Amino acid sequence: MTTNIRKTHPLIKIVNHALVDLPSPSNISIWWNFGSLLGLCLIIQILTGLFLAMHYTADISTAFSSVVHICRDVNYGWLIRNIHANGASLFFICVYLHIARGLYYGSYLFKEAWNIGVILLFLLMATAFVGYVLPWGQMSFWGATVITNLLSAFPYIGDMLVQWIWGGFSIDNATLTRFFAFHFLLPFLIVGLTLIHLLFLHETGSNNPMGLNSDMDKISFHPYFSYKDLLGFFLMIILLALLALFLPNLLGDAENFIPANPLVTPPHIKPEWYFLFAYAILRSIPNKLGGVLALLFSIFILMLIPMLHTSKQRSNIFRPMTQFLFWTLVANAIILTWIGGQPVEQPFILVGQIASVTYFSLFLIIIPLTGWWENKMLNLN
């Protein structure tokens, strides 16, 4: 009898257990597609980024010109840049949907995989931020100035920390060079942590929409879910192609077509759309240090969610009250995103403050209390 190399070779065996013979719950829906879509996004971003890095120069006098050169003179440079810029937006869409799926179906109770996922989100945000600075346009420069300046809010070490990150007394060549180094390095750190994320996930197996143990009803990942995931791949690639070819600047800021000028401040400084919800929370607190802490907590609050789970049921599928609160949270995040892009004036300030309080209240108080109340209603003491 011939041995199957897929099951015996020490290296191929690892891939086989992760992608081919992986026991998967038979009832997982399309919402479980986003993990593999994120893997595809990461591969697309690393490949396009590598080709951009071959032509980009991390120097303040030539950075903007090198991006123009990529778009005008490099073979398909315009396409590579458009895919990379819009690929970042799709990456964040997939990340937010992936997190929303985890929140809805109680996947956060796999604490190790969940916490690694939150760290991955933080690294992804850091990568996107330093990447946005690289074209050295107006919004790149002023966005970097505003966000790095926030560190000066920390008592005693703040100013020293800012100058340490800048590499001088203002944002200059040293800043751009190190941001390019970080932008090149961090995706590979993300790849490493993704493997650890998968390792922890495969220790427990996937969750499913019912939130129940599915050990008695598992099917192999390939061919069932590998083909199901291909549908998501095609849809995402079509969407990315449509964005990159027809509406490449839809999600960007027109201000970034102007070369960076330290003497002229743009009328409205705002980050890319995927940071606007956190930016709105930052702006809604009048105190600088309070705003910075709220900004950080708006992301790291996700790490507290496993500890705040009070319901005896894992998934939201049979919990109508918590379902309502989940969709309230989604609507609230959309409102925060809209507010983050508006000027700092009334009524946007008040709406932002209400939405920020609601955001933290839902996570910390309302949803845990509702879970406890549902247990009482169902006599699940």
From Swiss-Prot:
Coiled coil: none annotated. Belongs to the cytochrome b family. GO terms for biological process: mitochondrial electron transport, ubiquinol to cytochrome c. Keywords: Electron transport, Heme, Iron, Membrane, Metal-binding, Mitochondrion, Mitochondrion inner membrane, Respiratory chain, Transmembrane, Transmembrane helix, Transport, Ubiquinone. Binds 2 heme b groups non-covalently. It holds the Pfam family Cytochrom_B_C. A ubiquinone binds at residue 202. Heme b b562 binds at residues 84, 183. It is a multi-pass membrane protein. Heme b b566 binds at residues 98, 197. One of its GO terms (molecular function) is metal ion binding. InterPro entries: Cyt_b/b6_C, Cyt_b/b6_C_sf, Cyt_b/b6_N, Cytb/b6-like_sf, Cytochrome_b, Cytochrome_b_C_euk/bac, Cytochrome_b_N_euk/bac, Di-haem_cyt_TM. Component of the ubiquinol-cytochrome c reductase complex (complex III or cytochrome b-c1 complex) that is part of the mitochondrial respiratory chain. The b-c1 complex mediates electron transfer from ubiquinol to cytochrome c. Contributes to the generation of a proton gradient across the mitochondrial membrane that is then used for ATP synthesis. It comes from Squalus acanthias. This is Cytochrome b. SUPFAM superfamilies: a domain/subunit of cytochrome bc1 complex (Ubiquinol-cytochrome c reductase) (SSF81648), Transmembrane di-heme cytochromes (SSF81342). Its cofactor is heme b.
